[in-house]
Amino acid sequence: MADSIHYELQYLDLMRRIWVDGDERVDRTGVGTRSLFGETMRFSLKDDAIPLLTTKRVYWKTALRELLWFLTGDTNIRPLVAQGVKIWTDWPLEKYRKATGEAISATDFEARIVADADFAAKWGDLGPVYGHQWVNWPRYEPAGGGLFRRADHGYNQIAALIDSLKNNPGSRRHIFTGWNVADLDRMALPPCHMTYQFHVRSDGGLSCLLFQRSCDLGLGFAFNIFEAALLTRMVAEQCGLYAHEVVWTGGDVHLYLNHAELVEQQLARVPEGKPRLRILRRPPSIFEYRFEDFVVEDYAPQAHISAPVAV
């Protein structure tokens, strides 16, 4: 996209096209959606640019905490909730309510998750979701007699990616994915932003292509694109490269029918400003970044727009 055209206009155009021309269907949640299939957007990361939406406030600190949590390989919501991050609560809460019949509020459930480690261990785990697959993809080793057993330590796709980019930058195999077919049924939610491919330009620029099988354009996308850009910046820094671009491709890109007010408000707004992301410290590895290492500047978004989450 030309530098003179605001990066967010392509997002608003996609939102408008989905709302006007999208195929209306009943979805898994029962809410109903309008969707288009197979859409692509490109976002420059040059000069510290970061694709934060400006037509509504994006709580980028929450997204940052989520990405750092992914990189730990943890799958329990307890460390997130302890930091005030509640974006994953709905799934274990629904499971708890169905299993026990207790009409517990989200606030009380989260308080118990933080206060009681045993309760969190039983009810706060999401299954082998994103981070587990990223850094601990299951491996199997011979157990004799033609049998195999699960190895004690899984395969760290992120560490392998960094090594590959450093030692073989021209490779076309710089890929990691969270889509482990054998584990899908044990996940609270199968990965939406599922496969990442990286590309090193001849001038040392690093680009990331994210394939997202399912995209809630009204709510989830803002976090998805920010985290993809943030991860690209972190990977580039670790590999001595500069961040060039994020290319986003969505499979089923949809708007929920109960997001009409969100769509109307957001399409009435004009994007403005060019936020920047600065990384204050380069740790020895990508797994050692801390929350305080990141600063977003020149971000003056318009007012927050609330909308219900479809579980």
From Swiss-Prot:
The active site is at residue 192. One of its GO terms (molecular function) is thymidylate synthase activity. Pathway: Pyrimidine metabolism; dTTP biosynthesis. DUMP binds at residues 28, 172-173, 213-216, 224, 254-256. It is found in: Cytoplasm. One of its GO terms (cellular component) is cytosol. It is an enzyme of class 2 (transferase). It catalyses: dUMP + (6R)-5,10-methylene-5,6,7,8-tetrahydrofolate = 7,8-dihydrofolate + dTMP. Pfam families: Thymidylat_synt. Its main location: cytoplasm. (6R)-5,10-methylene-5,6,7,8-tetrahydrofolate binds at residues 216, 310. The keyword Methyltransferase applies. Its EC number is 2.1.1.45. One of its GO terms (biological process) is dTTP biosynthetic process. NCBIfam families: thym_sym (TIGR03284). Belongs to the thymidylate synthase family. Bacterial-type ThyA subfamily. Catalyzes the reductive methylation of 2'-deoxyuridine-5'-monophosphate (dUMP) to 2'-deoxythymidine-5'-monophosphate (dTMP) while utilizing 5,10-methylenetetrahydrofolate (mTHF) as the methyl donor and reductant in the reaction, yielding dihydrofolate (DHF) as a by-product. This enzymatic reaction provides an intracellular de novo source of dTMP, an essential precursor for DNA biosynthesis. PANTHER family: THYMIDYLATE SYNTHASE 1. Homodimer. This is Thymidylate synthase. It comes from Sphingopyxis alaskensis (strain DSM 13593 / LMG 18877 / RB2256) (Sphingomonas alaskensis).
